[in-house]
Design a protein with these regions (language model features):
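Gly-rich Lys/Arg/Thr-decorated short loops/hinges at beta-loop-alpha junctions or inter-strand turns
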Residues: 2-14, 33-35, 151-152, 222-231
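Active-site core of metal-dependent hydrolases
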Residues: 7-120
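Active-site-proximal loop/turn and secondary-structure-junction residues that shape catalytic pockets
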Residues: 44-48, 68-70, 98-99, 146, ...
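Hydrophobic/aromatic-rich, well-ordered segments within soluble, folded domains that form packed cores
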Residues: 61, 65-69, 282-298, 324, ...
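Hydrophobic alpha-helix feature that most strongly marks membrane-spanning transmembrane helices
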Residues: 69, 87, 297, 327, ...
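Short linear, low-complexity motifs centered on an aromatic residue
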Residues: 73-88, 108, 206, 213, ...
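Glycine-rich, acidic/polar active-site loops that bind/position phosphate-bearing ligands
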Residues: 121-305, 314-317, 324-559
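C-terminal amphipathic alpha-helical interaction region
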Residues: 491, 496-693
Length: 693
C-alpha cells in the first residue's frame, strides 16, 4: 500500500483540486455557493464542468453520471459518455455547465408513493456542490438531489438538505442571543456500519440469503456468541485482507474510515468513520455500503447488510452519532469551560431532549423496516421505545437544576445557576448499550437505525425536530425583559417537563415497557404500527413549517415504506414456501426412507432398531407439522391479493403472514438437527458463521 496521505482523496474533485484547476474568480464563486448557498452562474458552472471533465479524463474516465439516492434507500446512476461528434466523423470529450448542474433521468420507475404516475416520466437531478464529485469505476460521479417536474422530492437527499438549512437558521437565532459571531451551524454525523461476511460459495447455496438477504431457516449452531470471544477478537487473515482493501478504496474516495473490528456475533464486523457534515456523511455511508459489497466479491465473500441475517445471534445496526457545530469551531453539544458556555450547552441539550420527547413517534418511524423489526427490542439492540440516556452525572446535574439545589460530585463541585457545568470529560458518561438515544460526552448516539438504512431519513427528522424546539426557545427568549432570568427559567422548566424520557436503566428488562407506558412513552413495535405517525397532524405541521416535506411528500413516503414492508415479507414468504417444497421436505423424506431401509435390514439381522424407529417417528411428525404450516402460509399468501389498502395489507403481513412464517420455520429447524448432514440441502449456521478462515 502506498503512503496514505499521498493518495487520500485522490479520486475526489475536492478543494485542493479545485484550487489547482479553477481560475481564482471561479473558485471563489464556487466556494460561496458551497459555503453560503449562493446561486451559481451558468458561466461559472461551464468552467467548473470543463475542469471536472479534464481531471476525470486524465484519470481514465469516459463517462459521467448524476449520482442520486432515490427512495429505494440505495443509490442510482445513469451513465453518459463525454463524447461529442465532430463534423469530420471523430469525437471530442465535452461536458457543459448545464450537464453538470442538471440531469433528467426517467423518474417513473423509481418509488414515488403516488407522486408520479408511470406515464409522467420526467424527473430532474440537481447538483449538490457541497458534496464533492468523485470517480467510481472509471466514471465521474456527481452527487445530486432528485425531484419531480413540480419540485417534489423523489429522493432521500433533498429533504435532508432542507432540514440542514432549518437547523442552521434556528440555531443561529439562539447563538445570536449569546453574542456568538457564528454565521453557520452544521449538523454532523458519524455512522458506525456493522456487517456480516460469509463465504460466497456457501452463500450461493442458500436461496433465502440470495433472495431475502437473511436466513429464513436455520437451526442454531452448537456455538453462538456466548463465549464473548469474537468482539474485538483477532481478525482472521482473509477478513483482514478484505478490510485492508476496503480501507484503501474508501480513503481514495476521501472517506474517513477510522476504526475496524470484529463485532459481537461470529462473522460480524464493524467499520466506523470520523464524523462529517450530514449530507456528505450520508453520501459517504452509501458509498461505503456499495464498496463493501463490491470488495467482498473480490475476496470470495458475500457482505450481508441485512439487519438480522441469522436468528439467535446479534443483528447489525448503524449507530448514528449526531452533533451540531458552528463554522467557528464550537460543538454546541460539548459542555464549555465558562458559565456562559455551560448555559448555552444546557439550552441546546434541553432542546434535543424536548425534541426527542415531543416527536418520539417520527423518530421511531424514521428507522422502521421489515428487517429492523427483528432487531429492535430483541435483547441485542435498543427497544422500540424511545428514551434518552444521559448518564448518572449529567442526570444528577439536571435534577439539581430542577430542584434548585447545589450539585456536588466526588471529583467536581458545580454551582447551579448559570455556571452549571465544568468541562465534562467524555468518559464520565457510561456506555448504556440498551439505550436508543444516548448522550456520549459531546454528541448523541442514535442506536436504532438498521445496518442497511440510509442515514438520511433519521437525520432529516432529527434536524427538523431540534430546529422546531430551538425556534420555540428563541421566540420566548427574544422577547424576554431579562435574558438571564428567562434562560434559567426556560432550562429548568424544559427539564422538568421532559424528565419522563430520561432513562439510564436497562432497556432490555421486562420491567421497562411497563415503566415506559406509565411515563407516557410510545412503544411502536412494528413497521405497520410506526410508519403512520408521519401523517399525524403535528408531524405534518412541523415538516411543512420548515419546508422539509409537504403533506403530499409525507403521504408518498408512508405509502413507499408500507409497500416495501409488504413486498419484503411477500418475498420472504414465497422463498420459504419454495425452499420447503423443493429442498427441506424432499431431504427429510429421503432421510426417512433411508433410515427405514436401514431399520428393515437391521431387523432382518436380529438387531435392535430403537434409534431408527424413533428417528423416523420424530421426523415424520415434524414433516406433518411442517406440511400443515406450509399449507396455511400458502393459503394466507393468496389472501393478500384481495387487499387493496396498503396499511391494511401491511397489518395482514405483520399479524398473519409473519406468524405463519414462524410456524413453518419451527419444525423445519428441528428437522435440520435430526437429519444427516449429507442429506441437508444447504449450508448450516455452523458452515456460514465459523468456516471463514
Amino acid at each position: 500500500m502506498a503512503n496514505v496521505p499521498e493518495y487520500f482523496g485522490s479520486d475526489v474533485f475536492n478543494e485542493s483540486v479545485m484550487k489547482e484547476r479553477l481560475p481564482k474568480a471561479t473558485y471563489k464563486a464556487l466556494k460561496k455557493t458551497i459555503d453560503n448557498g449562493d446561486p451559481l452562474d451558468i458561466e461559472v458552472a461551464n468552467i467548473v464542468a470543463n475542469a471536472m471533465k479534464d481531471w476525470a479524463v486524465e484519470k481514465g474516465c469516459t463517462h459521467y453520471t448524476h449520482w442520486f439516492q432515490p427512495m429505494t434507500g440505495l443509490t442510482a446512476e445513469k451513465l453518459d459518455s463525454f463524447i461529442s461528434p465532430t463534423e469530420d466523423g471523430h469525437v471530442i470529450m465535452e461536458f457543459s455547465g448545464k450537464e453538470l448542474v442538471k440531469g433528467e433521468p426517467d423518474a417513473s420507475s423509481f418509488p414515488s408513493g403516488g407522486l408520479r404516475a408511470t406515464f409522467e416520466a420526467r424527473g430532474y437531478t440537481a447538483w449538490d456542490p457541497t458534496s464533492y464529485a468523485f470517480i467510481k469505476e472509471k466514471a465521474l460521479c456527481i452527487p445530486t438531489a432528485f425531484c419531480s417536474y413540480n419540485g417534489e422530492a423523489l429522493d432521500k437527499k433533498t429533504p435532508l438538505l432542507r432540514s440542514m438549512e432549518a437547523i442552521n437558521k434556528s440555531a443561529l437565532r439562539i447563538l445570536k442571543l449569546f453574542g456568538s459571531d457564528a454565521t453557520r451551524v452544521t449538523a454532523n454525523v458519524g455512522p458506525e456500519q456493522e456487517y456480516f461476511l460469509v463465504d460466497r460459495e456457501m452463500y450461493a447455496k442458500r436461496e433465502d440469503l440470495i433472495l431475502a438477504g437473511r436466513s429464513l431457516y436455520g437451526a442454531p449452531a452448537p456455538k453462538g456468541q456466548e463465549l464473548e470471544d469474537h468482539y474485538f477478537g483477532t481478525i482472521k487473515a482473509r477478513v483482514q485482507a478484505y478490510m485492508k482493501d476496503l480501507d484503501e478504496q474508501l480513503w481514495r474516495l476521501g472517506i474517513y474510515a477510522k476504526t475496524k473490528h470484529n463485532e459481537v456475533a461470529p462473522a460480524q464486523h464493524e467499520l466506523a468513520p470520523i464524523y462529517g457534515t450530514t449530507n456528505i456523511a450520508t453520501d459517504h455511508n452509501q458509498l461505503t455500503m456499495e464498496i463493501m459489497k463490491r470488495t467482498a466479491r473480490k475476496h470470495g465473500f458475500k457482505c450481508l447488510l441485512h439487519e438480522k441475517p441469522f436468528a439467535g445471534i446479534n443483528g447489525s445496526g448503524k449507530h448514528n452519532n449526531w452533533s451540531i457545530s458552528t463554522n467557528t469551531g464550537v460543538n454546541l453539544l460539548d459542555p464549555g469551560k465558562t458559565p456562559a458556555e455551560n448555559a448555552q450547552f444546557l439550552l441546546f441539550l434541553t432542546a434535543v431532549i424536548k425534541a426527542v420527547n415531543d416527536y418520539q413517534d417520527i423518530l421511531r418511524a424514521s428507522v422502521a423496516s421489515a428487517g429492523n423489526d427483528h432487531r429492535l427490542g430483541a435483547n441485542e439492540a435498543p427497544p422500540a421505545i424511545i428514551s434518552i440516556f444521559l448518564g448518572d452525572e449529567l442526570t444528577g446535574v439536571l435534577d439539581a437544576i430542577v430542584n434548585g439545589v447545589k450539585y456536588e460530585d466526588k471529583r467536581v463541585e458545580m454551582e447551579i445557576g448559570v455556571d452549571v457545568l465544568p468541562h465534562f470529560p467524555k468518559d464520565t458518561t457510561d456506555r448504556n448499550r440498551t439505550s436508543p438515544f444516548a448522550f456520549t460526552g459531546n454528541k448523541f448516539e442514535f442506536r436504532m437505525p438498521g445496518s442497511k438504512l440510509s442515514v438520511a431519513g433519521p437525520n432529516t427528522v432529527l434536524n427538523t425536530i431540534v430546529a422546531d424546539v430551538l425556534d420555540q426557545f428563541a421566540d420566548e427568549l427574544e422577547k424576554a425583559d431579562n435574558f438571564q432570568d428567562a434562560l434559567d427559567d426556560l432550562i429548568k422548566r424544559t427539564i422538568k417537563e421532559n424528565q419522563n424520557i430520561i432513562f439510564n436503566g436497562n432497556g432490555y428488562s421486562d420491567e421497562w415497557p411497563v415503566e415506559a407506558e406509565k411515563r407516557g412513552l410510545l412503544n411502536l413495535k412494528s413497521t405497520p404500527e410506526a410508519v403512520p405517525a408521519f401523517l399525524a397532524q403535528k408531524n405534518v405541521d412541523v415538516f411543512s413549517k420548515y419546508g422539509v416535506y409537504t403533506e403530499a411528500e409525507l403521504q408518498s413516503r408512508v405509502e413507499i415504506l408500507l409497500d416495501e414492508y409488504c413486498k419484503t415479507l411477500n418475498i420472504e414468504a414465497l422463498t420459504m414456501i419454495d425452499m420447503a417444497k423443493k429442498e427441506i421436505l424432499p431431504a427429510a423424506a429421503k432421510y426417512i426412507k433411508d433410515i427405514a431401509k436401514t431399520a428393515e435390514l437391521a431387523k432382518s439381522c436380529g438387531a435392535e432398531t430403537v434409534f431408527e424407529e424413533e428417528t423416523v417417528k420424530e421426523i415424520s411428525a415434524l414433516v406433518t407439522e411442517m406440511y400443515k404450516a406450509l399449507g396455511t402460509l400458502e393459503a394466507d399468501v393468496q389472501k393478500v391479493h384481495s387487499i387493496e389498502d396498503t396499511q391494511e395489507m401491511a397489518n395482514f403481513f405483520h399479524d398473519t403472514i409473519f406468524a405463519d412464517m414462524g410456524a413453518l420455520r419451527v419444525p423445519a429447524d428441528k428437522i435440520e438437527t435430526l437429519v444427516g448432514k449429507e442429506y441437508w440441502p444447504y449450508p448450516t449456521y455452523s458452515d456460514l458463521l465459523f468456516y471463514v478462515k
